[in-house]
Amino acid sequence: SLLGPSGCGKTTLLRILAGFEYPSKGTVSIDGSDVTDIPANLRPTNMVFQNYAIFPHINVKRNIEFGLRKEKISSEEMNQRVNDALKMVKLEGYESRFSNQLSGGQRQRIALARALVKRPKVLLLDEPLGALDKKLREEMQIELRNLQRSVGITFVFVTHDQEEAMTMSDRVAVMNQGKILQVSPPKELYDFPVNLFVGDFIGDINLLNSEISNIDGKNVKVLINGIGEYTIQAHTIINQNDTIVTGIRPKSINISSNDNKKSDIQVKGKITNTSFYGNLTYVYVSIEGVDKALMLSTAESLQGLSINSDCYLNINLKDIRVIKKNDP
């Protein structure tokens, strides 16, 4: 997936891959072949848009076979490929229907079938689920993932929804201001962000102002505001002159009503707010010397703790990330 805020260049990059835009420098290669100067209609790619672009005046069958009509194939092969495409998207028997007789999810699947029927090497998807409601979007995420696995071709999926990207992707490219900042599997992206933008953009994270005291290989001694000075193992290259923050994911902070729990770091705080989200409770805790309340998530009982209660936060050093403010 290509993931990033609106205007960061995701769709422009997709259009360059498709051949609708020409790169200002560099080349475009697909399956080892340079396609930079090959026009869009001759590239081994197909594109699915957010608005589906289903023709309302022709039925499903003719919509799907539209791209095949300029190819020199027999009507028997065309019918077979249309039937195969409908089977892929689980819409057999819908050949004679028109777009106004289809639900939003069905129209999206017809758009996918029309793209897949030409058997591209790369399928380009430009926020294709953006117009669907939450429940249908989640169902289509699973269907798209299963479809990609069954057809075995590369899907390049553009989205600004981090949850969507993390759910569906083998690899995620995080973009900002026209740059790709990090390309990693979802878990690696979440656990080991390369800079402040990636760490803050992917999921919830507590960011604490910090300064580098000393560096010994991958071991970085940092002074964390309101917490103390600790040696943390860095997962990216950190230099003495880098400006940093330290990051802690909410799931990595444990809360207790007393100081009996063992952890590398224990700090005292006061609960300022709680929010209930299904199976998780988010707890906000203010700590002396820290500008912003720390957020933690827990599936366990708060053990009698409530707003304005004093509490203890327990953190292990392995769960703290040293994050550069500047680009990697």
How would you label these PLM feature ranges?
Residues I38-Q50, I54-F197:
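ABC ATPase nucleotide-binding domains
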